[in-house]
Amino acid sequence: MEDIKNSAGLTEEEFLKQYKPSDYERPSVTVDMLILCMNKCLENLKVLLIQRKDHPYINQWALAGGFVGIKESTYEAAVRELKEETGLENIYLEQLYTMSQPDRDPRMRVIDVAYIALIQEQGVKAGDDAKDALWFDITTFNDEKLILQNKEKNITIEYNLTKKTCTKLDLFSWARLSPGRNIPTKSPRINSNLVISYF
C-alpha cells in the first residue's frame, strides 16, 4: 500500500516524527462525582460532599473528584478518586456532562468530566485530599433555593439560586461554593450566593 502524503509532502510517519505537542497549550482533565442516595427509610434524597483539605477552596464542601492520570481513562480516575476521597468502591458511575468553561478553575485551564450515581446509603470515610466526607440531605431544591443539611454535625449549606436564560440545569454548579469563603465544620448556617448555569 502506498504511503499517503500531506500537502507538505510528508507521510504520516514523517509527520509524527516532527510533530511537537509543545506547540499547543494542553488543559488538565479532572473528574467530579455527583453521588446521590436515598436514606434507609426511602424518604429523603442525599448528596455526598467532601470538605476540601487544601487550596483552592480550602475547607469548602464540594463534590468528590480530582485530576485524571496520564495513563487512565476518566472513568478509571472517577473510580479511583471516589475510593480515595470517600472510601466508596464498586459503584457504577454514569457519565453525565463535560464542563469546559475556560475560567472554571483558578489554577489553570481544566476540562471536567462529571459522573453521577444513585446508590444505597452507606458509610463514607474521608481520605487523600478530603478533610471530611458527609452525606447531606437535600431539604430544598427549587428555582430559588438549594438547602443541604447534615444534622449529625449541625451543618447547613444554603444557596440562593439565580437562573440565567437558557435551557438545561448544570447539576454540578450548585456543589461548588463561591471562592474565598472558609466554612467551619460546626457552623450552624452558611449563606452563599450561587448562580445556577443553564445551557
Predicted feature descriptions by range:
Residues 68-92, 96-199:
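Unchanged
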Residues 4-14:
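Entry/capping segment at the start of metal-dependent catalytic domains
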Residues 12-62, 75, 90:
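N-terminal strand-loop-strand
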